[in-house]
Amino acid sequence: MKIALMVITDGRWDYLQQTLQSASECLNYPFSQRLLVDDSGESVGFAPDGFDIIRNLPRKGLAGAIQTGWDHLNDDIDFVFHLEDDFVFPEPVDIPWMVEYLEADPSLAQIALHRQPWSPEERQAGSIYKLGPERFTQRPGWISQRHLFTFNPCLYPVEITKYTADLEAELTAALKSDGYRFGYLGNLDDEPRCLHIGVRRSKAYKL
């Protein structure tokens, strides 16, 4: 079982360092490949040890950066752990558990980690699960939904990278048209499994 860790950054080096530190502590898995896609548009940026660095010059935006990462995956990769540069983990992440659910159900496009409520609507509801609860169905150990393929921290099979990387809504539509659904790890009453720390984007960055 070969899993790639793919990290996307738009040049927010302070966030990225927090994300990588948290990943080193909480993603205890022997990744077969570690990619850092630098979409800052800078020729020189933060270069952590142990990562293959791919720099987009000029920058391509989020969807383009994801496509860059997908295009550089090794041919023998089975799964991708997707991580943007503004998330940290409050506790260790059980990646083999995520793999187990994906292998058991080929219709699952991803198992994601749910984050804390972020938007005003989410904060008022109390969690992402309570905002439109009819969209989420509890399964044994995971939560099923057909609403959105999320770019929040998640694991997906490499087959998903055969699609063209696009914004979440467009990629979701393409996957749903092929019968895929999406999942979150754990239970509806769990505490957040990842924390979004990105209160700002880099200047003039496009999604």
Language-model-derived ranges and their functions:
Residues I77-V88:
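Short beta-strand-to-loop acidic/aromatic patch adjacent to the donor-nucleotide binding site
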Residues T137, R146-L207:
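C-terminal catalytic/acceptor-binding lobe
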Residues P92-H114:
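Conserved donor-nucleotide/metal-binding helix-loop-beta segment in metal-dependent transferases, i.e.
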Residues K2-A4, Q33:
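Cell-envelope/extracellular polymer assembly enzymes that use nucleotide-activated donors
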Residues I111-A125:
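Short beta-strand-to-loop element that shapes/binds the nucleotide-sugar donor at the catalytic cleft/hinge
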Residues L57-H72:
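Glycine-rich, basic loop-to-helix element that forms the pyrophosphate-binding segment
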Residues S24-R55:
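Acidic donor-binding segment of Leloir-type glycosyltransferases
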Residues R12-C26:
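Short, well-formed alpha-helical segments that are part of the catalytic scaffolds
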